[in-house]
């Protein structure tokens, strides 16, 4: 039984299978090799694909599309609010998650985006089964490289709902690179930039392809909310305003008229890729009024100018992350229907100083082609040219946990190869602490408040011990689908707990991802200052507690009472100062450290305990996690990183 590759797109989906040594892209029952990602609900039936899109003007409120723009997001995501202005169907909040409300067979129904996507996936599965003449369960499904953990998990869930065993979730540009590398029989080592601009998402990935068989992703960047639909929206707004200006009627209140206008705008956009002018003719568009107009390519380019320019920022970022300059890129490969737009091509060509773009692979089918190859590899196909293929992908965002002072301590860095596993040792933050709370984040900023919380779990039952003594091993395991599993283990008792980060944790909005990554560069200096400030605070805190503990536990006769009281008074003063100056600057912490060292060092030297005291308590380090259960009534962080 063969495995299939599915490109689940925002506007169109495509399915392929690898057999007899080649990939076949499978046509649907209408004879089309791509299927609209549309689902319609009527009084009598549910329609998927071409039939759903064909009846959209008659039934706009109950025809659902763009599920990929909703999947794995929260209802209050500003991007969803923006999209809702353009959608004729109703999106409602269900416990903070978006649900789509439709009328089906006379009843009101609510569907999650995963359910709508699963219906499209089921259609692709049926298309493949009809062609192959047997039932299919195994599949590889593609997602934008910049999809976060929640969106990947939700896509995988959609596959399961559709009755598929999802062998792997792979990144769309990586799949396209696989198609390009195998199709072109590349020789030697080549750096390839995949520019993937589809109906709703945009990705840039740079790969090094060695002898057409080793595919190593060097970097990835993008915007999960930029694509052909956004260009359509600009054109629809322009045409609706022209209609209002000409006829003093606002058609935007009428979903059917707006849908007919959108269909005409999409057709005009496609025409403008090959002609310099497109004609729009719609009979009885609104209140019996016909609408005839022309749109020039120049006007369309002006309407979308900022969106087109925005495609170059991720290209620059991908080059920077891959540590390459423009001249080191051998091939620029265009993927996704929106790369047919001449202005997008010319901007990219100018950016690369006139270098020719590679237009030799089918931009609509390349991703499904690569997914089909990966499906064959994962199901054990050893035939021909795919037997030596090795694919090495990367994590799109850094992953870590919160340590004292709200610092993001990264365990897995952005653009790190996947699958990967990283372990770090942390400890408790206060004496006799019975448990720790591990808070998991993704993002690029230095402080967790600027990143996105993925999940949290508590590890309890830690035996009573001084702060810094228990050893808690935290392991991040990022699987080949880009889905994260986190575990924590207390080494002396062997107690362990783990969590798979799922999309029910109140996940990241795309606006936040964009902000995190883009602002990380802008605020690098500020982040570094904040990091240093927290490091200085932690060093002072660690030192003062270690000194205090050493003096309190000093054997009788090792230290005279006056010295002991002098050190304890100074330590208690410092602790009080720390409690009332939590937001002090780095210089203030450093000054206090000098003052305390000057006062305590001579006395500690007398004791011959300087090194031993610090060692016993685990030394200065970063501290981790907000306390979940309020252990011992202490409300601060509850784990400490061990050097």
Swiss-Prot record:
A Pfam family the protein falls into: HSP70
Effect recorded for residue 306 to N: In strain: DSR 4
PROSITE patterns named in the record: HSP70_1 (PS00297), HSP70_2 (PS00329), HSP70_3 (PS01036)
InterPro entries in the record: ATPase_NBD (IPR043129), Heat_shock_70_CS (IPR018181), HSP70_C_sf (IPR029048), HSP70_peptide-bd_sf (IPR029047), Hsp_70_fam (IPR013126)
Documented effect of changing residue 208 to A: In strain: DSR 1
Outcome following mutation: residue 483 to T: In strain: DSR 2
Keyword Cytoplasm: no
Biased composition (Gly residues): 612-635
CDD domains listed in its UniProt record: ASKHA_NBD_HSP70_HSPA1 (cd10233)
Disordered as annotated region, ranges: 611-643
Keyword annotations from UniProtKB, A to Z: ATP-binding, Nucleotide-binding, Stress response
GO molecular function: ATP binding; ATP-dependent protein folding chaperone
Protein induction: Heat shock induces the synthesis of seven proteins at five otherwise inactive sites in the polytene chromosomes of fruit fly larvae. Two separate sites, producing two and three copies, respectively, code for the 70 kDa protein.
Annotated phenotype, changing residue 25 to T: In strain: DSR 2
Note: Most strains have three copies of the gene coding for this protein at chromosome locus 87C1; two tandemly repeated Hsp70 genes (Hsp70Bb and Hsp70Bc) and one in reverse orientation (Hsp70Ba). Some strains, including that sequenced in the Drosophila genome project have three tandemly repeated Hsp70 genes (Hsp70Bb, Hsp70Bbb and Hsp70Bc).
Protein family membership: Belongs to the heat shock protein 70 family.
Protein name: Major heat shock 70 kDa protein Ba
Species name: Drosophila simulans (Fruit fly)
Organism placement in taxonomy: Eukaryota, Metazoa, Ecdysozoa, Arthropoda, Hexapoda
């Amino acid at each position: 039984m063969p495995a299939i590759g599915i490109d689940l797109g925002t506007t169109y989906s495509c399915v392929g299978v690898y057999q007899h040594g080649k990939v076949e892209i499978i046509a649907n029952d209408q004879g089309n090799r791509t299927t609209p990602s549309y689902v319609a609900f009527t009084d009598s039936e549910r329609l998927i694909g071409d039939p759903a899109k064909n009846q959209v003007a008659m039934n706009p409120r109950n025809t659902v599309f763009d599920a990929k723009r909703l999947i794995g997001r929260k209802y209050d995501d500003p991007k969803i609010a923006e999209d809702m202005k353009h959608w004729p169907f109703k999106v409602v909040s269900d416990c903070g998650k978006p649900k789509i409300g439709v009328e089906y067979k006379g009843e009101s129904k609510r569907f999650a985006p995963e359910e709508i996507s699963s219906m499209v996936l089921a259609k692709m599965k049926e298309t493949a089964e009809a062609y192959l003449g047997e039932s299919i369960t195994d599949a590889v499904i593609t997602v934008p490289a910049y999809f976060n953990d929640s969106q990947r998990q939700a896509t995988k869930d959609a596959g399961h709902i559709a009755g598929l065993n999802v062998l792997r979730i792979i990144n769309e540009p990586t799949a396209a690179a696989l198609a390009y590398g195998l199709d072109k029989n590349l020789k030697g080592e080549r750096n390839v930039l995949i520019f993937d601009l589809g109906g709703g998402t945009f990705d840039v990935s740079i790969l090094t392809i060695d002898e057409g068989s080793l595919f190593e992703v060097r970097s990835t960047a993008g915007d999960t909310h930029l694509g052909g639909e956004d260009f359509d929206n600009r054109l629809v707004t322009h045409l609706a305003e022209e209609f209002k200006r000409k006829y003093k009627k606002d058609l935007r209140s009428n979903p059917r008229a707006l849908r007919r206008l959108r269909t005409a705008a999409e057709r005009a956009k496609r025409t403008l890729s090959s002609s310099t002018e497109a004609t729009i003719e719609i009979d009885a568009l609104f209140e019996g009024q016909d609408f005839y107009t022309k749109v020039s390519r120049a006007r369309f380019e002006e309407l979308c100018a900022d969106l087109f320019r925005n495609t170059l920022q991720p290209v620059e970022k991908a080059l920077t992350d891959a540590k390459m300059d423009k001249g080191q890129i051998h091939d620029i490969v265009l993927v996704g229907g929106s790369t047919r737009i001449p202005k997008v091509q010319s901007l990219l060509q100018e950016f690369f100083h006139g270098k020719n773009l590679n237009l030799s692979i089918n931009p609509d089918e390349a991703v499904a082609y690569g997914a089909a190859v990966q499906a064959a590899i994962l199901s054990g196909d050893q035939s021909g040219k795919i037997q030596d293929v090795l694919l090495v992908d990367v994590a799109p965002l850094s992953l870590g946990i919160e340590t004292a002072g709200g610092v993001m301590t990264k365990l897995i860095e952005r653009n790190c190869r996947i699958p990967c596993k990283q372990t770090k040792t942390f400890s408790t933050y206060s004496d006799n602490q019975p448990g720790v709370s591990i808070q998991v984040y993704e993002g690029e900023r230095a402080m967790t408040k600027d990143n996105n919380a993925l999940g949290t779990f508590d590890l309890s039952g830690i035996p009573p011990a001084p702060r810094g003594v228990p050893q808690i091993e935290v392991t991040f395991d990022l699987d080949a689908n880009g889905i994260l599993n986190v575990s924590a283990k207390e080494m002396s008792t062997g107690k362990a707990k783990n969590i798979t980060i799922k999309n029910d944790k109140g996940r990241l909005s795309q606006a936040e991802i964009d902000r995190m990554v883009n602002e990380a560069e802008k605020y690098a200096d500020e982040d570094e200052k904040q990091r240093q400030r927290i490091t200085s605070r932690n060093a002072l805190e660690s030192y003062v507690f270690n000194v205090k503990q050493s003096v309190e536990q000093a054997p009788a006769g090792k230290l005279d009472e006056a010295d002991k009281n002098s050190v304890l008074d100074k330590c208690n003063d410092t602790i009080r100062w720390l409690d009332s100056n939590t937001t002090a600057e780095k210089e203030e912490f450093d000054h206090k450290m000098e003052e305390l060292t000057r006062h305590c060092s001579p006395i500690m030297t007398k004791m011959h305990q300087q090194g031993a005291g610090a060692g016993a308590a685990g030394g200065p380090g970063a501290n981790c996690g907000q306390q979940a259960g309020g252990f011992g009534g202490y409300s601060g962080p509850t784990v400490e990183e061990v050097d």
